[in-house]
């Protein structure tokens, strides 16, 4: 981290760089989940810092716009110390993926030749034993991957086992391969290439607003959600710029996570299109045709103001109310 901060903030003194690193290192004063959420916000949005005799400013911990400025490392058997009954002990996660000295993803592996070892055991290692023994590592580690060499699944460090999913395509349009051992290569190329990894890390990890941290909801997109949100954004931009009115249609099966796909898309439109004057600060309207979808959508979106960055979220129940609501704002929300 010190190398990255010095390179991207040459005006800061060594003491000021150390203050920033100390703030990040000593982040854990709340619950484990609240600390994880706070640190993730710092990683994505930067950390506020006030240099001597200067105004407060945001200091980036990761450079998303220019990925080559970051320092990427994959470390095998990284030793993490903890204290148990007054004795210093260690844990060694199989692989940690570091960006600028921060362990953003933990990978736990099991031997496919061992008939008693499963990827569920890998999940237990992270979700039970590591959270029990080395939470101070996982505070900085939103993503988790588990694999036995045949089955490989992506999730988050707080996700239930059933919310870990395979990543079956490197790029949209690729055929889905179900061959043994292909899941490992598809995960590596589809998630862990540096540019793709930062894209997923920045905009496709979902936390509810801080007021709901007690619910401990953290998810990462599945591969259909990632590619759908990407394509929908591109289609909407093209439609708005060309004034064609052809935004596109997305078909999703029941249970595929369409509501989260819409949340990922809304975040993209709100935060990643600011340089497109035709879009600017958009007002996004989500129309549903079933009561259960309205309840599902309003429950998610009203708890996602920070994630969406769209201001107040309103549930509107009639066309007249919608007309009145839109009449009170120019854009944004």
What do these predicted regions represent?
Residues 1-283, 288, 292-308, 329-332:
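ATP-dependent helicase/translocase motor core
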Residues 247, 312-321:
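Long, charged, glycine-rich C-terminal linkers/tails
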